[in-house]
Amino acid sequence: MKFEAVVRTEQGKGASRRLRHAGKFPAIVYGGTEAPVSIALDHDAVINQMDKPAFYEAIELVIDGAAVKVKPQDVQRHAFKPKVEHMDFIRI
């Protein structure tokens, strides 16, 4: 499973809200020897794959052209809408 991601330059609540209104959501990739990276993912592309068991085993994120193998660590969902608010990924 592969997803395209872009590095986030803006941080904070306002920037995250703008991302969500644009059909994306914020996430972070951490672990290993590299520094944590804040990214933005396309909401529809991810939400359509979340019901598959393979999603929770190994994912390949393409972050600005570099492929990174990750595993979802935490998913924050909206309280009553079927939306993802934020995700944490850990490098494998």
Swiss-Prot record:
Top-rank taxon, per record: Bacteria
Check the record and name the CDD domains matching this protein: Ribosomal_L25_TL5_CTC (cd00495)
Q: Answer whether the UniProt record assigns the keyword RNA-binding to this protein.
A: yes
Q: Name one Pfam family in it.
A: Ribosomal_L25p
Which keywords has UniProt assigned to this entry? Ribonucleoprotein, Ribosomal protein, RNA-binding, rRNA-binding
> Which terms does the UniProt entry file under GO BP?
translation
Query: Coiled-coil region(s) at which residues?
Result: none
User: Which molecular function terms from Gene Ontology are attached?
Assistant: 5S rRNA binding; structural constituent of ribosome
Q: Does the keyword rRNA-binding apply?
A: yes
Q: Which cellular component terms (GO) are annotated to the entry?
A: cytosolic large ribosomal subunit
Q: Which PANTHER family match?
A: RIBOSOMAL PROTEIN L25/GLN-TRNA SYNTHETASE, ANTI-CODON-BINDING DOMAIN-CONTAINING PROTEIN, RIBOSOMAL PROTEIN L25_GLN-TRNA SYNTHETASE, ANTI-CODON-BINDING DOMAIN-CONTAINING PROTEIN
Assembly and interactions?
A: Part of the 50S ribosomal subunit; part of the 5S rRNA/L5/L18/L25 subcomplex. Contacts the 5S rRNA. Binds to the 5S rRNA independently of L5 and L18.
The UniProt similarity line reads: Belongs to the bacterial ribosomal protein bL25 family.
Q: What does this protein do?
A: This is one of the proteins that binds to the 5S RNA in the ribosome where it forms part of the central protuberance.
Q: What is this protein called?
A: Large ribosomal subunit protein bL25
Organism equals: Aliivibrio fischeri (strain ATCC 700601 / ES114) (Vibrio fischeri)
What gene makes this protein? Answer: rplY
